[in-house]
Amino acid sequence: MKIRLFFCICLLGCFAGPVLAAQNIRRAVPVVVSDNSGRSEKPEMVVQLDNGRPVYIHKNKKFDCSGAVNHGGGCTRVVFYAAINGIKLTPDGAVREIGLLIGLKDVEVEISSDLQKGSCLFDAVLKHELTHLALHRRILTRFAPEIAKAVLAVVEELPAPLTQTQINKIDKVLNGFVVRMMAEDRKQNDLMDSQDAYLHLQSQCPE
């Protein structure tokens, strides 16, 4: 069993925060038949982590951070996802290699237009959201090996040839992990958004 782990990092930076959604992305799965006589007996796994591409919202007069506790003028929204990202088969239809894509999508960071860009409070709120980013990335990194092992355990038991029903079984495993990642992420980020943390943020910028 081989697991290869790659990171897809956005050049513009990636943000994540307390307003979350879970999604198991269903897409057309590319399946390639490869005649590789030197393959190992067990399938290989390739995992890519996607940190997402953020959209910044600051000019929106209708500040909407519903669901974010003690946001203090800023919040983020993000969708967690996990999906099959390609399958290579042997000539007899057994899985030789399977790819997974695990990450964040539809990432938005919103800061109230009442906070002037470059002001002390604007910078403090932005710094707070960047800390949320670090927590989200740790969730992805933490769960990726466990997800890979769980999917491989399922794949190794699948009889050839691979069928759509079997692919759906893998999707179900991925969806369960998306829910788990979301729950753990919520717990970790809620610790950052306590009343004490909110008061500390406000105290950094006395009028």
Language-model-derived ranges and their functions:
Residues 1-7:
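Bacterial N-terminal signal peptides that target proteins for export
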Residues 7-15:
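Bacterial N-terminal signal peptides
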Residues 17-21:
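Sec/Tat signal peptide C-region and signal peptidase I cleavage site
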Residues 29-113, 154-207:
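Metalloprotease/metallohydrolase-associated module, dominated by Zn2+-dependent proteases
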Residues 104-106, 117, 122, 126-127:
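Extended, surface-exposed interaction regions
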Residues 124-136:
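Active-site recognition of the HExxH zinc-binding catalytic motif
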Residues 137-148:
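Membrane-interfacial alpha-helical segments at the cytosolic side of multi-pass membrane proteins
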